[in-house]
Amino acid sequence: MFSFWIRKRIFSLITFLLKPIIKFEIEFEDGVSDELIKEAETVYAVPTNSVTDLVALQLLTESLNIFRPLSKISNSNLNRFTCLKAPVFSQKHQKIMRQASYNLESIIELDDSHVSIIPTSFYWGKHPDKQKSLFKILFSQSWSATSPIKKLFKIIFHGRSLVIQFHKPLAIDELKDKGKNTKDNANLISRYLRALFRRSKQAKLGPDISHRRTLVLSLSQNTEVKKEIKRLSQGNAKIKKRLKKKALKYANEICSDLNYPIVRLLIRSFTWFWNKRYDGIHLKNLEEIKKISSENSIVYVPCHRSHIDYCALSYILYENGLMVPQIPAGNNLNLPIMGKILRGGGAIFMRRSFNNSLYSTIFFQHIRNLISRGSSIEFFPEGGRSRSGLSLPSKPGLISMIIRSFASLESVNVKIVPIYIGYEKILEGQSYLSELSGKSKKGESLLDPLRVLKDFNNYLGNAYINFGSPIDLADFLREEVKKLDLKENELNEKPEWLRKATTSLGESIIQGINSSVAVTTTSLFSISLLTDSTQSLNEDKLKQRINLYLNLIKNSKTYDHVWLTNTDASEIINKTVGLKLIKSQLVGNSKIFKPTDDETSILSFYKNNISHIFILYSTVCESLRYVNEISYDEVVRLVRLVFPFLKRDYNLLETDSELDELIKSALKTLIKSGLIEETETGNLIKPNSNTTKYEDFIALSNICEPSIKRFFIVLNTLWEHPSIQREELKKLCTKIAKKLETIEGWPYPEFSDKNKFDQFIDKLLLDKLVKEDEDLNLQAARITKRVKKDYLNFFNQQFINHINEMN
């Protein structure tokens, strides 16, 4: 009795001393509230035997006027809390053993079947935006063990930024196994609580990688790695020993060393950057990701436009209490000092080539381990940055690894989250200029981030992150390959279905990114100005064009979830001018916008960010452009002819099964907007050539015209050369396209991009419209010549003459 009195008085004294220091916020999981706690027969479960956590809980319950943890359960002498205890080394058994959770066995033995356990988590220092002190950052929450001194500093520095989270109640009667005794049931419930607290902490902080040395060692000694070493050594002991050393070296090179003090220091610098150089980062649809984060391993797959994409997503996830992802990065960044900082921020360094089978096995096993532990991963599916502003085709490497890892694991939930990251002005604008002007692309360089420093002091406007609809990997594979079992001994093999599934998932990811695009002020300005045939508009006409494109977006059946960040035409123009992307000219009393060559090149980047939204509208208009009158059925037929290639070119969402309905909807919108007119007989015609509507009609047609012309260049070259090597075909097509750029004045360098020709040739081969013989020569199938006449509907005679002259 005296001992109990002493403990109670000590607890009261500690509570009195800590009360002025501790300030908390409360988080309730869905379905939990203070009213529910009041009404139920409640017992709190806390994750550690911590007096400070218990004091904080006592203060919180007093403020909410609900059951206190030290109050008694009805009709008993038991406190309303249980806590898990850290394992200890047993001298008797000579091993580390779990300790019984405080009070739990006694609670289980109660006759009251209505007692519920409410797991309660504590997060000290979860507001990095409010942390100005280096000490606050160093003593904030992490997975590493906490000494009494560090715990004291944690309370001093983070007592006023504590988050207490109440999880869903657990009915003891439902958790108990009636066939087991009290002790076994206590162990069972303790295991369940440990797993719950671990998942919750992992969702906030990321996986526990506080023992990196152990992780590196276990990765290098993984079963599959051992098998690969055995295969490569072929029984030679010396080779086997050398390969083991290499495996350890590779594992050490690959593994991140996620360090939360480093993360918080980086976050602090990012906060300054986003608030000083940009007007902050604006978010959409993050709540959906929060809901699924605790029960799923999340793979974030954002588009890649800028070097700062890396810090943008990690910053936002951390700021919103989500796990910091592990990010595969090129090992060219693994330099002294910088490499350690990046590794501490979650970087997984990887080589550009996976030709080394031992290295490939180790890297794959690491990705598999991350997924099995519920880690978040972030990578850019396009590979490198898009200098044109268009979405690039996905690279198969990491996507394939994610699929193989998931297929070989049981009871793991994986969600792939496409993300659009957009900027009103990218930091690399000037450094991209040469490539946007049509010069060949330079490779990635370590100095690239330093080259953008000259733009660092400029005002950069707003940044946007829009989270797309998550792709459930189990559902995707079930639909795609109809089977999910991949045996352990086949992990290093690639099943027949993998390539198709990888391609399909890659396409779904890029389409998911495109469907989540943030339509920025600069993108709307750029597409409105650059699609005009003269590329010169006065302010009033430019406003009218912007409003037209806004209306088309709002009426789109496919892209109805894109983010319109600004819908005021005047503000859109003023913002673009304010960002110094273009200067206006005063001609008489009119303000004219006519970009210079450099301005056109930069603006084309922003135009390309949203071009895909208008492709269906544009193709419908293009089918009418060079004919006097056309039937509805003929429009559908012509659009269907070219749309499969446009779909691949722009990573479009429209499916073949819904295309007819979407064309009908697009026609309805275009007719309502006055860009297409109906005759008395029900046929379709373009507007009168002397009207503003005709200018808008032509501007909209201009969006898809370069792509259709590029398709025709390839087909016509194949018709002129019955058997030709792929590289020679690309060379001839690029040469023709460059000449046409000069003749027709195309300002878009992607018109003659070799990669675009590559994509079209791939699609022709896939659809068996082009055949490849034993000597790798390409030959056009006969069916392609039948569509030649149809393709001519999309061009004027002048273009056809130019093509004939060049072949």
Model-derived segments and their meaning:
Residues 1-807:
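Membrane-interfacial terminal anchoring regions of lipid-handling membrane enzymes
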